[in-house]
């Protein structure tokens, strides 16, 4: 083998070695770029999952808010139905009081007695009508005093009754569907 041939073989071997180095470097670059691409894809998936979770959370919150609005509207409608006549009921209370005051007076003439019976029937009809619409009378004589239902107008000593017992009622109270429209004005026992 000549020197020239030997140099050619060495050059070819060197070229082959360089090609192999380039191929492995190229493969490493390709593998690195595939790894990078995979990492980027994972990051994108993670971002999309977070966005999806965020939208799910917003949808759940919106649904809950809509449910709360619906319940609030139902409650408002129910209260409007129950307490819509409250002002009307309050305005009728003095009428009931006047009729009851008229009925307390003794009448001696026969015509007046018939008139009193008519007023009694009218009063009963009015009270029955109001009861049908949720108005309840509070006549708490003999009951324990409750500041939520009663208004103390006076206190008297009386050893026959316990303290805070309602001895007398100045003016009846009224409730509309369980809500106090007017507290009963009462005299309570205080020993």
Curated annotation (Swiss-Prot):
The lineage of its organism: Bacteria, Pseudomonadati, Pseudomonadota, Gammaproteobacteria, Thiotrichales. Residues 1-35 are annotated as: Disordered. Belongs to the GrpE family. Participates actively in the response to hyperosmotic and heat shock by preventing the aggregation of stress-denatured proteins, in association with DnaK and GrpE. It is the nucleotide exchange factor for DnaK and may function as a thermosensor. Unfolded proteins bind initially to DnaJ; upon interaction with the DnaJ-bound protein, DnaK hydrolyzes its bound ATP, resulting in the formation of a stable complex. GrpE releases ADP from DnaK; ATP binding to DnaK triggers the release of the substrate protein, thus completing the reaction cycle. NCBIfam families: PRK14139.1 (NF010737), PRK14140.1 (NF010738), PRK14148.1 (NF010746), PRK14150.1 (NF010748). It holds the Pfam family GrpE. This is Protein GrpE. The gene is grpE. One of its GO terms (molecular function) is protein-folding chaperone binding. One of its GO terms (cellular component) is cytosol. Keywords: Chaperone, Cytoplasm, Stress response. InterPro entries: GrpE, GrpE_coiled_coil, GrpE_head. It is found in: Cytoplasm. Homodimer. One of its GO terms (biological process) is protein folding. Residues 1-15 have a biased composition (Basic and acidic residues).
